[in-house]
Amino acid sequence: MEKRLRLAPSPTGLLHIGTARTALFNWLYAKKTNGKFFIRIEDTDIVRSKSEYTTNILDGLNWLGLSWDEEPIKQSKRISIYKKNIKKLLEIGAAYRCFTSESEISELREKQKSSGLPPRHDNRHRNLTSNEIKAFLSQGRSSVIRFKIDDETEIKWEDQIRGEIKWKGRDLGGDLVLSRRALGDEIGDPLYNLAVVVDDNFMNITHVVRGEDHISNTAKQILIYKALNFKLPIFSHTPLILNSEGKKLSKRDCVTSIDEFREMGYLPEALANYMAFLGWSIKDSESEILSLKEISRVFNLSDINKAGAKFNWEKLNWINSQYIKQMELTKLRQLIKNYWDDMGWESPSAEWDLKLINLIRDSMLLLKDAIDQSKPFFTLSQMQKEGEEFLNNKDETRESLKYILCYLKEENISTIDSNKAKEIIHKISVENSIKKGILMKSLRVAFFGCLSGPDLIQSWELFSENKSDITLIERCLI
């Protein structure tokens, strides 16, 4: 039988890292089993759902490389279908109209709270007579539709990640609301638990993979599946993503949306690679750098951990740096060039760009690191304290720079490649009895304003090509 999986996000915000990982796990299992992966947009909350969030979610999934089969389904287009199923539940006696007002519910909650009881509805209108219903309707009372949940009912299923899970009806908060309020004999707009069941059945979903925060929803939904005589899918509940303190990752942890990761300079391949290991581990593998295709070959839902997965920034940064190091230079240039363009920096040539990127990429964790790493090659570096001290405390330093400057001007050298740079340093060192180390440190201070930086010889070649090496040396001799 074909495996059919889905992601069902609500477009009430930007694509979250947790939603993206859920999408990834569904996508990986679909690929592993030659199944299908679908998108369903759960936009029945008209007030909070925004089309721009739908666009953001789909764009984010595309960016991560998570393609889907068929056009996404939108729940807002299927309201009448949900209402038909609610009507069916009413007809078979599995659901009923509840006229409890908001103020009555608030009063009930306060009593339960003061008594130290968990919040749950008291099902007070489950057995209303037809005359009582008519009386409420004549008063103009609005109603919701509630699904009957017997306190003694036991719900259990075999979860592919957690094994057998059991719930008692009494632990589900009372009879479940299926629809929003409506007047008269109308049925209000459907709510999450009803719509999900109807859609998963309609889409022939065979496997539901979602976060552990949905476990109680699964218990409720199983009862609706059975009442509507729908075939149950196989359920899997993934662990939550936790922050460094072991609490659920939230917006308070600064970065949670895929847009933010993208803007920070994470590569989609790296982020997807890292997300796969957030709660899942691969057996007998020496490498943690794996493409989605490679991961899909060995992925199994049963290998996902039950315990929460702590988000590790250092690990993500390391994985991202490996992808930067491995990326084809011309492709990496296209990405980094965007940052340079935003800074208003212009380079002498595409070839020069490639040389610079090759020089700095081993020091980059994120794409945006290219700004700081390449800044000295586009703008004059400020002289730092250690650079000033080196210039002022060693007589040989300024002498070294004078010799280099004179040589460049006397020989009328316009550009310098790596071999020429080494030749000049060797020649001046021998002819003037100056240690090569002093010469190279002096040049480094001239170029970068400090004693650290990328490879000096390759750097000199780049400074020479953009005609700034002489200017940088001269500023140290003023």
From Swiss-Prot:
Q: Which CDD domains match?
A: GluRS_core (cd00808)
Q: Does the keyword Magnesium apply?
A: no
Role noted for this protein: Catalyzes the attachment of glutamate to tRNA(Glu) in a two-step reaction: glutamate is first activated by ATP to form Glu-AMP and then transferred to the acceptor end of tRNA(Glu).
Which intervals of this chain are the motif 'HIGH' region?
9-19
NCBIfam families in UniProt: gltX_bact
Relate the assembly described in the record. Answer: Monomer.
- Return the protein name: Glutamate--tRNA ligase
Cellular-component GO terms for this entry: cytosol
Reaction it catalyzes: tRNA(Glu) + L-glutamate + ATP = L-glutamyl-tRNA(Glu) + AMP + diphosphate
Gene name per UniProt: gltX
- Offer one Pfam family short name for this entry: Anticodon_2
EC numbers for this chain: 6.1.1.17
